[in-house]
């Protein structure tokens, strides 16, 4: 995909994309392209590139839809930054108080995702006009259906009740009559599935350009959508899970079948998924990733700006780092393992994890930077309980996320300063570990507990061997790493809880946790317990409360509601 981003300026005149407007302003128009001149494979390809480019087209945190700023609502992460007023809209989200329909961040994500859909639909419309002699037509249409499904999926996870724009020939007048309640919850998921099935039936097993989705990517995406759909929310006046659908779970099993992923597998070390160097990009575990580049002739390269607020403020290195999205103490405690090498489940948060005494899952040290250990495994940047590692003087603790950050030694090469800090590290959307965990969850819910536990143990076996960066930690820093596999038999309820915990540990700080809690119907119970336990050590939660049947989803933005001419209905919860 990196190479297809370079031709983006070629389509400015076709779709109104303005990144190259200075170039256009320097020339006198010489005429208008006829319909037949526009309907060429070259122009269709350029429109497809424009749709992909939405993921790298802006120097700000929402540019690639990473979702970390909405995951601060979970028990995995604090907002971070320099106090509660720094990024106050994120603080409102993390305590679930004072969230307004006019918050800029809520509207901004809505607008960006529908802009993505607009570009995709423009590409689909033009592709449909090209002749059958365009050999890539069907494949490009499948790619666009995949991207449209992705945008609708993100919107539905965030706002629940959304207008689906699946008619690429929709007129402006028709668009203004769309309703966000045309489809009920299950029907909305099915709209996304329909696009994905078209993609799945056409996409190839491999792509020359790495950023384009493959058949396996469509399969992984279908599994995820069916898993969300399985947890039915049938009551229009509630966001509660009313039932778990067996048929949808069986679809998850179908689309996570190992035969669909012959080209994929687990990395030997989980950390390989979160390294920017070329030899680690698009590895065996990466099924579909947003591609970023450097040194491509543009000012900064097509960099990942979505993590721009996350790096800490290290003097002489990451100066100006904003220190957002900080791992919570609760998450750190969750990695604590017992004498049997297994998670502590109901008791992990009864005491603060002590690295000098307590056993821990090795993934802790690959997910969370902690005082007493080197930041990003670089001994030149030892972490301490100082302002370097907390702009808020400890209000949000001194932990730092490792999965989004890059070793400061790579500044100027893979880590670059613009308005924020950005890197060329790809953002993996679907990785093979997620596929295994989705399959395990479906098996557990269907009562096939042995198969579920076997899949969890695959993940844990890989975790035990993920020590290439931290092998010296026990002898050098005194940490105690111990993880073991599950043995014996477990009933359905036990297996489900095992899968949920494993998903939290494996996918920690990848912006999935809050959405998982909502999907399971666990959000109110888990988060209100979390708030109550955090108050004594984290004052930001003194007024925090999760209101069931409201806070599971964002409100429909005020500006969108106002412009809908009465066709949109606000989400439940008295916004």
Model-derived regions, located:
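Bacterial Sec-dependent N-terminal signal peptides
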Residues: 1-29
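Membrane-proximal, proline-rich intrinsically disordered regions
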Residues: 20-69, 339-342, 351, 356-358, ...
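Conserved, well-structured interaction surfaces
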Residues: 40-49, 53-59, 83-159, 175-190, ...
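Long, intrinsically disordered, low-complexity segments
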Residues: 113-116, 191, 274-337, 422, ...
């Amino acid at each position: 995909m990196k190479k297809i981003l370079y031709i983006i300026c070629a389509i400015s005149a076709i779709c109104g994309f303005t990144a190259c407007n200075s170039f256009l302003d320097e020339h006198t128009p010489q005429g208008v392209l006829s319909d037949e001149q526009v309907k060429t494979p070259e122009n269709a390809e350029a429109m497809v590139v424009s749709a992909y480019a939405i993921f790298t087209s802006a120097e700000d945190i929402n540019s690639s839809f990473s979702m970390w700023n909405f995951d601060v609502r979970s028990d995995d992460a604090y907002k971070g930054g320099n106090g509660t007023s720094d990024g106050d809209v994120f603080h409102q989200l993390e305590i679930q108080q004072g969230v307004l329909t006019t918050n800029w961040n809520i509207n901004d994500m809505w607008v960006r995702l529908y802009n993505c859909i607009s570009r995709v639909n423009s590409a689909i419309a033009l592709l449909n006009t090209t002749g059958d002699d365009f050999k890539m037509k069907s494949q490009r249409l499948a790619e666009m259906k995949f991207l449209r499904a992705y945008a609708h999926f993100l919107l539905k996870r965030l706002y629940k009740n959304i207008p689906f724009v699946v008619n690429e020939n929709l007129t402006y007048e028709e668009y203004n009559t769309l309703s966000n309640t045309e489809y009920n919850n299950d029907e909305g998921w099915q709209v996304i599935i329909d696009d994905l099935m078209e993609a799945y039936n056409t996409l190839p097993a491999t792509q020359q350009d790495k950023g384009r989705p493959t058949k396996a990517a469509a399969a992984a995406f279908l599994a995820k959508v069916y898993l969300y759909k399985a947890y039915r929310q049938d009551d229009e006046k509630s966001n509660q899970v009313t039932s778990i659908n067996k048929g949808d779970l069986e679809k998850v099993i179908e689309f996570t079948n190992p035969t669909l992923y012959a080209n994929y597998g687990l990395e030997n070390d989980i950390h390989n998924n979160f390294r920017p160097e070329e030899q680690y990009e698009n590895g065996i575990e990466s099924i579909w990733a947003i591609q970023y580049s450097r040194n491509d002739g543009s000012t900064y390269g097509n960099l990942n700006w979505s993590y721009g607020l996350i790096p800490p403020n290290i003097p002489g290195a990451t100066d100006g780092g904003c220190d957002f999205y900080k791992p919570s103490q609760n998450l750190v405690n969750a990695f604590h393992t017992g004498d049997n090498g297994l998670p502590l489940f109901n008791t992990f948060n009864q005491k603060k994890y002590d690295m000098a005494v307590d056993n821990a899952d090795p993934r802790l040290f690959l997910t969370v930077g902690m005082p007493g250990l080197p930041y990003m495994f670089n001994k030149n940047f030892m972490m301490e309980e100082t302002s370097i590692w907390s702009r808020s003087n400890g209000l949000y603790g001194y932990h730092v996320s490792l999965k989004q950050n890059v070793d400061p030694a790579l500044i100027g090469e893979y880590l670059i300063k613009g308005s924020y800090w950005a890197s060329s590290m790809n953002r993996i959307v679907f990785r093979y570990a997620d596929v295994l965990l989705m399959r395990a969850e479906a098996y557990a819910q269907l009562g096939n507990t042995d198969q579920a536990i076997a899949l969890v143990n695959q993940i844990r076996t890989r975790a035990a061997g993920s020590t290439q960066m931290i092998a010296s930690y026990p002898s050098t820093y005194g940490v105690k790493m111990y993880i073991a596999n599950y043995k014996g038999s477990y009933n359905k309820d036990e297996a489900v809880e095992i899968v949920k915990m494993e998903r939290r540990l494996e996918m920690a700080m990848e912006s999935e946790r809050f959405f998982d809690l909502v999907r399971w119907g666990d959000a109110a119970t888990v988060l209100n317990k979390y708030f109550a336990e955090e108050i004594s050590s984290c004052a930001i939660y003194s007024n925090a409360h999760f209101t069931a049947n409201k806070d599971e989803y964002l409100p429909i933005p005020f500006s969108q509601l106002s412009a809908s001419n009465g066709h949109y209905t606000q989400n439940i919860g008295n916004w």
